[in-house]
Amino acid sequence: MGRSLKKGPFVAASLLRKIDKLNDKGDKQVVKTWSRASTILPQMVGHTIAVHNGRQHVPVFVSEQMVGHKLGEFAPTRTFRSHSKSDKKARK
């Protein structure tokens, strides 16, 4: 079930404030955030946002195709280590 259109997209207030300040200055600094649930808005395009993945902040450069998606989609939380080869010695 999606979010009500009446409410609008969720964006952390602190993140939105930081992005608006950078847009007013015309500055392009990396913005650090822990808010993975925030929706990417059109005013965020062109900025680099460092999204926390539970261990570190992953830099995400926001492009036009990302608008409407969540920040957490672009910062993977799990690292996949390949499956071990079927080795007879390793099993014993």
UniProtKB/Swiss-Prot annotation:
Recorded superkingdom: Bacteria
MF annotations from Gene Ontology: rRNA binding; structural constituent of ribosome
Protein's UniProt keywords contain Transferase: no
Gene Ontology cellular-component annotations: cytoplasm; small ribosomal subunit
Gene3D superfamilies xref list: 30s Ribosomal Protein S19, Chain A
Protein name: Small ribosomal subunit protein uS19
PROSITE patterns given in the database record: RIBOSOMAL_S19
GO BP, one annotated term: translation
Pfam family, one: Ribosomal_S19
Its job: Protein S19 forms a complex with S13 that binds strongly to the 16S ribosomal RNA.
Organism, scientific name: Synechocystis sp. (strain ATCC 27184 / PCC 6803 / Kazusa)
